[in-house]
C-alpha cells in the first residue's frame, strides 16, 4: 500500500505514477499527483487525475478535472466527452446533456456520443428518446454486442422479458462473455421466474470473478465472520459484475423465503465498509437485517432521501411495506404524505390500494374491509378467467401458451394472497377468530394449496379454542415435510401442534414430538446459538394448563422451560408467558377462586426469586424498531420482584 511518506526521487515521478496506474492503484496515484503543485494546472496532470478519479468512481472530482481541461484546451473533443461521461456517472443527467449539446460534434466520437445520449435518455426514463438514439447507432466496429445489450435494456423496461433475453444472448454470442450482459440475462430469467437458469448465469459470473480477481476477497467476510479488510470499490469490482450477481442471488433466496440464504449471498460479497456499499447492496441488507427492523428502516430512509438515480426504484415500496410489517402504520402514512410525487411513479395501483387499506384499518376497519373486498373481487375475477385459460391451453396441448398462462395465474395469485391475508387480519387483531375463519374460507377457492395460507388458517383454527383437530390437520403436513430438520419449523407451529394433540387426547403424539425436538436441540448444541424451540413448546403448554386453572402443573412447566428462571432462556419473549400466568394466579388468589398447595406456592416464589436475580438487566418488554424514548425500559428483575411481593402479600392474607 502506498504511503504519503514514500520518497520518490527526482526524474522518477512519471514512471512511478504510470506504474501505479498500470497496477490499478489509482488512489495511490491520486495521492502522489496531489503532492505535485503543477498537477492541478497542467494538461498532463489534470488528464491523469481525471482518469484516476473516474476509475475510483469519484465522478464529481473527475468532472472537475475535465472541466479545467476544457478551459485549458477547449478544442480537444475527447475531454468534452469525458466531462459529459463523468457528469452522467455522477447522476447529473441534465448537465451532461448540456455539455454534449455545446460543441461535441466530432465524427470520430459520434458512436460514443450516441451511446452516451441514449444512456442519459434511459436514465431519465425517456425510453422513446433512448430507442430513437439507438436506431441511429451502427453495429459495425465491434459495437454489435453493445447495441444488442442496449436493445435488451429497452425491451426489459417494457416488461418484454423474453425478447430482452434474446437480445442479451445475442450480445453474449457476438461479443463473448461479459459479466454485465450475463447479469442482464439472469435478471430476465428471474423476472420470468426461471430461477435455476438465473442461478446458472450467476454461478458463471462468480466463478470467473473469483478466478480473474482473487484480490477482491470473495467470501472473506464469511470466513472471518465479518472481520475482513475492506477492498473498497476498485475498477475490478465494477468490471467483474460480482456485486450485481450476489445481489440477484440474494433476491432469489429472499423471494423463495430463505432469509438466511439471502444474508449468506450478501456476506459472500467482496468486503467493504458500509459507506463504501453501493445502493442496491445497502437496500438488500436493509431487507435481510437479522437484528430487527430499526437498522433496515434507517437504511431505506437514507436511500429514499438520496433520490434517483442512486436510490433503487423498489426502495419506496419496500420502506412502506417494512413499516406495515412492524405495525408502524402512522409512519407509513407520514411517508406517503411526504412523498406523494413518488406514489404514482413507484407504487402500482394494486400496491397503493393494499397499503391504503392497511393504514385505513387503524382508524376505520369497516372502510378498510370494503377496500380490500373490492380489491379481492377484482383479482378473484382475473384468477377465474386465467384458470379457464390454463384449462384451454391444457386441452390444446400448447406448451408455450400453457407456460405463459400458468405464469400469469401465479402472478395474479401472488397478488391475491396478501389481500386475502389482510382481510382475515382485520378481525384477527380484534380477537374475532370466527370472522377471521370466515375470511379464510372465502379465499380457500384460490389459496387452499398455498403453504402460507395453510399455516395462517391453522393459527386461526387453533385460536378458535374448539377446533384443535382441524388445526392439527393443517399443522401436521408442515411438520412432516420438515421432520428431519425439525428445528427449521417455527417454534409456534410445534407448540400449537403439541397443544392441539393434548386437547384432543393425543398425549403420546405430543410427547413424541417434544422428544424429537429435544433430541434435535441436543445434537445442535450451542454451535449455532441458542435454541428456544423446546422452551417455547413448554411455555405454551404451561400457559394452556394455567388457562385451565391448573396453575400447579402449568407454572411448574413454565419454570422447567426457563431452567428455573436462572438460564439464558430468560428474555422478553419468554418472560411475557411467565407474567401472564403469574398475574392470572394472583387474580384468582385475590378473588379466592384458586387455592394452591404451600409447596407449589414456595416453588413459584423460588422461581420468581431466580428471575429477579438473573433478569436484573434484561428488558421485560419488546420495543419497536425505531422506539427510543430515552428512558430505561423496565427489567425482568424489577417486574419479578413486584410479582413476588404481591404473591407474598396474598399468601399472608387471612
Curated annotation (Swiss-Prot):
* CC annotations in GO: axonemal microtubule; cilium; intraciliary transport particle B
Alphabetically, which GO biological process terms does the record hold? intraciliary transport; protein polyglutamylation
Q: Where found in the cell?
A: Cell projection, Cilium
Recorded hits in Gene3D superfamilies, A to Z, give:
Tetratricopeptide repeat domain (1.25.40.10)
The TPR repeats extend over 10-43, 44-76, 145-178, 180-212, 393-426, 452-485, 535-568
A GO molecular function assigned to this protein is: intraciliary transport particle B binding
Organism domain of life: Eukaryota
**UniProt record similarity statement:** Belongs to the TTC30/dfy-1/fleer family.
What role does this protein play?
Required for polyglutamylation of axonemal tubulin in sensory cilia. Plays a role in anterograde intraflagellar transport (IFT), the process by which cilia precursors are transported from the base of the cilium to the site of their incorporation at the tip.
What is the official name of this protein in its record? Tetratricopeptide repeat protein 30 homolog
